[in-house]
């Protein structure tokens, strides 16, 4: 099977175009791609397949060629904006602030896609500032390249349904250089020393036998065989999953490859994905024999088996599970939810029911911070471990209330999930607690998302009442969720962007953890601003013609922006401290 896969994939690799092997010819396929613009907005070329073409003009901040071409480019955009999508492309990876300042000073308002790693410009074979390229967003072929003076004729040809008469014209302008590419292609990139460590660190934990990914990246042969796919998912930013804007904040789980890592992988693929040395680091990786992230749990809570039919829409299920075996109060330091059948369990919410509780608890937090945080199941989420010296008290006799969301897959199955819980040593009482709040919108203030709206915004604000350290951010929307940003508005009138989830993906609902907790003063407002894509361009959209209400099911929508923090003066609550 692997040999056949390798043969097929190498044939596909040979068909890919890399500008390092020579200049790109007219109508040659470059592949799909995605980039963030100077405002941090995500643009995926395939999303624009309802346009006749995507038009790109090469921009650099100090380029006279860009300045000279800009007025005509703007005029053409004004004449053709209904049928064509216009961008500028910065192939030098210049800083976002400097590009934004350039856009502001020139007053054109055209989104500038910033190619930090030069991998898109290289694939497009961008050669000079001021150069214009026309990309077919369905075939991903460059149908015209040349000066702006030839653009009108090219667009008229495309508008008439004809091939571009003159697909390539010479262009003058400052030469675009590729120092990292040229340096890499002048040597042989080492699979064992350079490539395998990147794949091991960023891919192999999911792409392994028994992992959640669809194939195991456990050898050079597999990496080489899948190299065309690796290139495609890097170009479109589909993998690693759950990526956020790397220019905003510093997170432990941003899942963004560095510029150097992206270049190393793609240049290695361009060289033929060759192996060096006698050993294969990927084949030597060893994984724990258990899925439990922190060793064998101190307590395993078994969720009652849930029978899932082959078809149909399932109501949310409410289950209450006792913490069997907990005969004395214990402080919780970590927890993990292992789904019995990931194909049907979409997500869970949970809440602790203390002894004597009547069950009327919120699934959205905001309860006593002395209570423990038991992790829910969210696609792609990592097991939860409290910050150092932080925890909540699980009282003997407590129960766990679970809300389970299942989807059907065409086959009957039974989900038998488990929740692992790890305690602090007996007698140890952590000094700190976690708090937080959700910037949520519910039915009383919900505004239905209009039909066919590609970018419908919502926003909600929460206030941090005391000095606090921010720890994490969790966005939650459904199929139409597009993006979400969190911004701090400080009491002195200043503001700061905290995180930009530029390409929200319903399949990867992650809680993003700051590498270093961020101190904010009392009275800080945190604004979560998100947008929904209810257009037919959103391929996951169940019904673009529908006015979308708030609702629990995935074809309805939600808006949650959860924030976790730790108050500076937050120690044990009076009730617990007194015990």
PLM regions: where:
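Thiol/selenol-based redox catalytic cores and closely related redox-interacting motifs
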Residues: 115-177
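Structural microenvironment flanking redox-active thiols in thiol-disulfide oxidoreductases
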Residues: 65-106, 113-123
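Short active-site neighborhood of thiol/selenol oxidoreductases, capturing the structured segment around
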Residues: 46-67
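Structural micro-motif
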Residues: 31, 53, 108-111, 126-133, ...
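Beta-strand-centric surfaces of beta-sandwich/beta-rich domains
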Residues: 241, 246-251, 281-331, 336-469, ...
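Aromatic- and Gly/Pro-enriched helix-to-coil junctions and flexible linker segments
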Residues: 168-326, 330, 347, 397-403
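N-proximal helix/coil linker or "cap" segments that precede and/or mark the start of modular domains
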Residues: 16-32, 158, 165-183
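Bacterial N-terminal signal peptides that target proteins for export
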Residues: 1-10
């Amino acid at each position: 099977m692997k040999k056949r896969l390798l043969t097929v994939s190498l044939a596909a690799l040979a068909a890919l175009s890399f500008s390092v092997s020579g200049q790109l010819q007219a109508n040659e396929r470059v592949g799909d791609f995605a980039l963030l613009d100077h405002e941090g907005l995500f643009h995926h070329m395939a999303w624009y397949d309802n346009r006749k073409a995507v038009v790109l003009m090469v921009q650099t901040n100090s380029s006279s060629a860009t300045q000279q071409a800009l007025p005509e480019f703007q005029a053409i955009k004004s004449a053709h904006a209904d049928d064509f999508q216009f961008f500028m492309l910065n192939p030098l990876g210049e800083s976002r602030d400097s590009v934004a300042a350039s856009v502001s000073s020139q007053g054109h308002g055209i989104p500038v896609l910033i190619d930090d790693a030069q991998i898109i410009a290289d694939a497009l074979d961008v050669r000079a500032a001021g150069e214009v390229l026309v990309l077919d967003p369905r075939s991903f072929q460059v149908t015209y390249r040349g000066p702006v003076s030839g653009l009108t004729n090219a667009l008229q040809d495309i508008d008439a349904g004809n091939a571009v008469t003159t697909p390539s014209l010479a262009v003058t302008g400052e030469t675009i250089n590729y120092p990292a590419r040229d340096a890499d292609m002048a040597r042989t990139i080492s699979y064992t020393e350079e490539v395998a460590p990147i794949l091991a660190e960023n891919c192999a934990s999911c792409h392994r036998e028994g992992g959640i990914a669809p194939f195991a990246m456990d050898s050079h042969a597999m990496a080489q065989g899948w190299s065309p796919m690796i290139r495609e998912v890097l170009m479109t930013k589909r993998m690693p999953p759950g990526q956020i804007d790397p220019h905003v904040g510093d997170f432990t789980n941003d899942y963004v490859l560095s510029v150097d890592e992206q270049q190393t992988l793609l240049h290695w693929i361009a060289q033929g994905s060759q192996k060096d040395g006698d050993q294969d680091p990927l084949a030597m990786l060893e994984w724990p024999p258990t899925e439990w992230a922190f060793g064998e749990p101190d307590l395993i809570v078994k969720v009652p088996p849930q029978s899932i039919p082959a078809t149909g829409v399932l109501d949310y299920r409410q289950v209450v599970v006792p913490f069997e075996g907990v005969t004395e109060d214990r402080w919780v330091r970590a927890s993990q939810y292992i789904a019995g059948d990931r194909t049907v369990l979409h997500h869970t919410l949970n809440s602790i029911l203390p002894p004597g509780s009547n069950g009327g608890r919120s699934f959205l937090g905001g309860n006593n911070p002395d209570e423990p945080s038991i992790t829910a199941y969210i696609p792609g989420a990592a097991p939860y471990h409290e910050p150092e010296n932080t925890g909540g008290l699980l009282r003997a006799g407590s129960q766990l209330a679970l809300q389970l969301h299942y989807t059907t897959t065409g086959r009957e199955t039974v989900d038998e999930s488990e929740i692992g819980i790890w305690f602090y040593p007996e007698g140890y009482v952590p000094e700190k607690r976690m708090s937080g709040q959700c910037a949520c919108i519910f039915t009383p203030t919900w505004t239905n998302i209009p039909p066919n709206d590609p970018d419908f915004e919502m926003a909600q604000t929460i206030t941090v009442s005391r000095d606090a350290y921010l720890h994490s951010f969790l966005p939650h929307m459904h199929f139409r969720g597009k993006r979400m940003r969190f911004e701090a508005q400080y009491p002195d009138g200043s503001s700061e962007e905290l995180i930009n989830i530029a390409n929200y993906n319903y399949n990867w609902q992650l809680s993003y953890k700051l590498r270093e907790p961020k101190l904010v003063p009392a009275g800080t407002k945190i604004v979560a601003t998100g947008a929904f894509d209810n257009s037919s361009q959103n391929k996951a959209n169940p019904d673009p013609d529908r006015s979308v209400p708030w609702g629990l099911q995935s074809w309805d929508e939600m808006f949650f922006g959860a924030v976790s923090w730790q108050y500076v003066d937050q120690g044990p609550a009076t009730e617990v401290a007194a015990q």
